[in-house]
Every structure is written in structure tokens, then in C-alpha cells.
Regions:
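A short beta-strand micro-motif
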Residues: 3-10
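Generic preference for well-ordered secondary structure
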Residues: 8, 16, 31-34, 83-86, ...
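Compact, glycine-rich, soluble single-domain proteins
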Residues: 15-72, 78, 103, 111
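Short, cationic low-complexity segments
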Residues: 76, 82-83
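Short secondary-structure transition/capping segments
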Residues: 76-77, 94
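C-terminal charged interaction modules
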Residues: 84-112
Length: 112
């Protein structure tokens, strides 16, 4: 069995999240479960690397990802139900607003 050590990368920072992880699931958040059955939830992140030989999993954090994952969840729901959910439009507007803020913040930090 392969237990993973999970790291979270954000901007120029990498930190350990948990270890001995056997299970990972992406919903609106990433749900991680270790060998003892302890569950850790990581918000606004995606899995960027899984390496069995190194027994490591790397996650990327960005605040904008929370609503992107939510949008994808609602998209799946729409297809399953065969109808459009107006909540998709609300989430999309939130993503655009967060995207503008994200770009402005990056420009302020790094220059234009």
C-alpha cells in the first residue's frame, strides 16, 4: 500500500498538510483521509502531482479555485438533471470578480 505525504503549494510557499494519506477526492474541496481514517479538508486547491515512487502528493492553493470547483460541480449537476441551474451564472460572476481581484493583486505585487 502507498501512503502519501501531502504538501500544499501557494505562491512562493510550500507547507506540509498531512501524511500517510490513502484517499483523496476532489469535490468543492479536496478531502484527504489517512491510514487512521482521519479526514483533512483543503479548500481552494487542486491536485497538481501524485508520485507513487516518491509517495508524495502536491496540491496547489489559490483562492479563485474554490468557485471554479463549485462551478464544475454545478455543471455536472446540470448534465445529470438535464436542465440549467441559474446558480451557475451567480458562480461565474463571482469567478470573474475574483479573477479581476487576483490579476490586480498580482500586478500590484509584481508590477505591470
Amino acid at each position: 500500500m502507498c501512503e502519501f505525504k501531502v504538501k500544499l503549494s501557494s505562491e512562493n510557499n510550500v507547507k506540509d498538510v498531512c501524511q500517510d494519506v490513502l484517499y483523496a477526492k476532489i469535490e468543492e474541496n479536496i478531502i484527504l483521509r489517512d491510514v487512521l481514517g482521519t479526514t483533512n479538508t483543503v479548500e481552494s486547491a487542486i491536485i497538481t502531482e501524485v508520485s507513487v515512487p516518491s509517495a508524495k502528493m502536491t496540491l496547489l492553493y489559490s483562492p479563485i479555485l474554490k468557485n471554479i470547483l463549485k462551478l464544475l460541480k454545478f455543471q455536472t449537476k446540470c448534465y445529470e438533471e438535464g436542465k440549467f441551474d441559474t446558480k451557475m451564472t451567480e458562480i461565474w460572476e463571482a469567478i470573474k470578480k475574483e479573477g479581476d481581484s487576483f490579476i490586480n493583486s498580482l500586478q500590484n505585487k509584481l508590477g505591470k
